[in-house]
UniProtKB/Swiss-Prot annotation:
Belongs to the class-I aminoacyl-tRNA synthetase family. TyrS type 2 subfamily. It is an enzyme of class 6 (ligase). It comes from Xanthomonas euvesicatoria pv. vesicatoria (strain 85-10) (Xanthomonas campestris pv. vesicatoria). It holds the Pfam family tRNA-synt_1b. It catalyses: tRNA(Tyr) + L-tyrosine + ATP = L-tyrosyl-tRNA(Tyr) + AMP + diphosphate + H(+). This is Tyrosine--tRNA ligase. The keyword tRNA processing does not apply.
């Protein structure tokens, strides 16, 4: 059994803030398993690595013997979380929410231990709540308090509309903690206001206030913006292993350490520090560290054999040796007259623009099936299939098709 110090070290790994740490220490000292809650609104059908930051922390609590509650916000999903939004979010239909919720249940157990997980839906209590009960809940906070939230304050200051139902969202999320008698609630840094709302409501209803633990928002593949499906800088946990490997191997060297901190179970903080020292001293290539992370992620969401096959496919492209047919085939739609090479590189997502594609060609940084190509006007027509590589990290196995 872990000591309190060991528990705090694991719980604190990667965490942005713990409120309040002394209360967490006191509850750990009782030896009683904590009820650890994290809520997910099923606004999209698939989870990506950004979502798993919270799931990983839940798994760490499970490793310490605690019970986690994976709360599916089927009720709140129909409201739409306004956190970080500069405009009112379009609510989802009941059918969309339930369909997405089913896929969430299938995906989370790639990380969480079923035996120590409660899956709950907040429609369990909100579906029974009367209009009078909702009004009583709304009376617990003022409009002035809601406007303390940064996103609401900005929208109010710029005269952007804020719908009444958006003010309800923090209260509704906070009441989830009352209904579940949560000891700890996890959330992203953008959720802090809502999580603190839960503490206040628990006290109002005579419960001990939950400990709030916030986790950073994971940067996506570009290393800049928050991982998001809409930005295209994400890795979905249901993606093929080869995609998980190839995308992970494309991230910047500095971002690798951030991902290890927030996503890895196998690499401890102490080992990560040693690896970083070895890389800095030139004793270890950063690619080897990245490859270890890619293998861990592909194994977690698939299995060891599939992960090794994916790594073999990636290695075949990088070295020019091996079986490139292991790479996923990406279909690129081309007009009947075909597509020039510069346009093909852009259409395949290997360069952001035709001008950048032309520049890469002039630098002799483009290969097709291992051979350097330079002519931007070379035309490719439907039926062409090959592995195109731009620089060291960007490559794709493409098949040209007509619309």
């Amino acid at each position: 059994m872990a000591t309190i110090e060991e528990s705090l070290a694991l719980i604190g790994r990667g965490a942005e803030e713990i409120l309040k740490l002394d209360q967490l220490q006191a509850r750990l000292a009782t030896g009683k398993p904590l009820r650890v809650k994290a809520g997910f609104d099923p606004t999209a059908p698939d989870l990506h690595l950004g979502h798993t930051v919270l799931l990983n922390k839940m798994r760490q609590f499970q490793q310490l013997g605690h019970q986690v509650i994976f709360l599916i916000g089927d009720f709140t999903g129909m409201i739409g979380d306004p956190s970080g939004k500069n405009a009112t979010r379009k609510p989802l239909s009941r059918e969309d929410v339930l369909a997405n919720a089913r896929t969430y249940e299938e995906q989370v157990f790639k990380i969480l231990d079923r035996e120590r997980t409660e899956v709950r839906f907040n429609s369990e209590w909100f579906g029974q709540m009367s209009a009078a009960d909702m009004i009583k809940l709304s009376a617990q906070h003022t409009v002035a308090r809601m406007l303390e939230r940064d996103d609401f304050a900005k929208r109010f200051g710029s005269q952007q509309p804020i719908a009444i139902h958006e003010f309800l969202y923090p209260l509704v999320q906070g009441y989830d903690s009352v209904a579940l008698k949560a000891d700890v609630e996890l959330g992203g840094t953008d959720q802090k206001f809502n999580l603190l709302m839960g503490r206040g409501l628990q006290e109002h209803y005579g419960q001990a206030p939950q400990i709030v633990l916030t986790m950073p928002l994971l940067e996506g593949l570009d290393g800049v913006a928050k991982m998001s499906k809409s930005l295209g800088n994400y890795i979905g946990i249901n993606e093929p292993a080869i995609d998980i490997v190839t995308k992970t191997m494309k991230i910047g060297d500095e971002l690798t350490w951030r991902w290890i901190d927030l996503l890895s179970f196998d690499i401890s903080l102490a080992e990560a520090a040693r690896l970083k020292e070895q890389v800095a001293a030139g004793e270890l290539h950063p690619r080897e560290v990245k490859l270890r992370l890619a293998r861990e992620l592909a194994t977690r969401f698939h299995d060891a054999a599939t992960a090794e096959q994916a790594i073999a496919g990636w290695h075949a492209v990088v070295t020019g040796q091996g079986d490139t047919s292991l790479l996923p085939l990406q279909e690129v739609v081309v007009p009947d007259e075909g597509l020039r090479l510069a346009g093909l590189l852009t259409a395949a997502g290997l360069t952001p623009s035709n001008s950048e594609a032309t520049r890469k060609l002039k630098e002799r940084a483009v290969r097709i099936d291992g051979e350097v190509v330079e002519d931007p006007s070379r035309v490719f027509t439907h039926g062409f299939e090959g592995v195109i590589q731009v620089g060291k990290r960007n490559f794709a196995r493409v098949l040209l098709v007509t619309a």
